[in-house]
Amino acid sequence: MTGELVLLTGGTGFLGYTILIDLIKHGYRVRVPARSHAKIARVRAAPSIAALNPPETHLMFVLVPDMAAPGAYDEAVQDVDLIIHSAAPLHTDQATGAAGDVKLEDAFVTACVQGNLGILKSACDKGKRVRRVVMTSSTVAIAPADFYSDAASAAQREAGNEVVRGPDTRVPVPAPPYKSQLHAYCSAKAASLKAAEDYIKDHSPHFDLISIMPSLIFGKDELATGTASTGMMMSRLLPGTDSNDSNNNNFGKGEITAVGNAVLCNDVARAHVRALDTDIEGNQSFVLNTDAKWEDTVPIATTHFPREFESGLFRPGGPHWTTVPLKWDTTKVQDVLGIKLATYDVMIKEVVGEYLEKTGSE
């Protein structure tokens, strides 16, 4: 509802910033917790914010240095009508131990669960006007974690591919020890989703909960300096875009197997904001995903950017990708939210286009 005040966590990050832009465009007033003045300044100076030029009454910031601390959001939630919790307080810098180290559980699972419970507790105790909390979850929260690593055998993946998972799918939370940071991340998403849903069920607060479950998010990142964000994604998919490969010749060898799921950042942001509307029922979830074949990345890019391939800026070849299909039922996204999800073709065009903008190669 236009004019309502939204507390947006994660608003200084990739997805959260895109949500922020969508909120402002749709007339919401937004309060963004930030860890530092530097992060606030970076958002204020970003191109879309500068172009929209929202008044101070429509874009506000509050310093929250430690978002995992008990009561961290107690002040931020006051007088707020709605909350979008897109922050993911994962302490990856602390997860430096060997695989299975307890540090993985603390850095990923504990941090993520505490983040979700912290915002819900603050909303329950201090946010008396809050009517809805929209949380960013992930498809990895509701699929077997082994599908996203090498732990699943080909036979297990083949059998799993016959299953169509949807917004009501739930899986047991994988227990430690964790084999890798990716395994711990999947566990963190499953555990934090369960913790949030259990909290709503056990406490019956004055607000409801909607979970948005995107797959791998692709899209422009205005806040990234250089090609740090786009390059990280594209360097694995498109030979010639690895900023760490000075010769542009040795990168992209070997075999890579990955789940073929992707979604456009703008679509994910739109889903979060649309979920705030009063005509959308609470206490439900939405899965956002488009099937992707990583093997198609170079052919798609060649179609949209032929000159860059002719010049040698991008090169055909690279690693041999094997796409693991993982099926999702996303019908609610269009039927309920009215969002038609972008194709993988659109994602590649947008991300490669931004890469060229940031490198001045257009």
Map each language-model feature to its residues:
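C-terminal amphipathic/interface module of NAD(P)-dependent oxidoreductases
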Residues: P306-E362
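Active-site Tyr-X1-5-Lys
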Residues: R170-L209
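NAD(P)H-binding glycine-rich loop region in Rossmannoid oxidoreductase-like domains
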Residues: R35-Q114
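A conserved pocket-lining segment of Rossmann-fold NAD(P)-dependent short-chain dehydrogenase/reductase
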Residues: P174-S180, K220, A224-V263
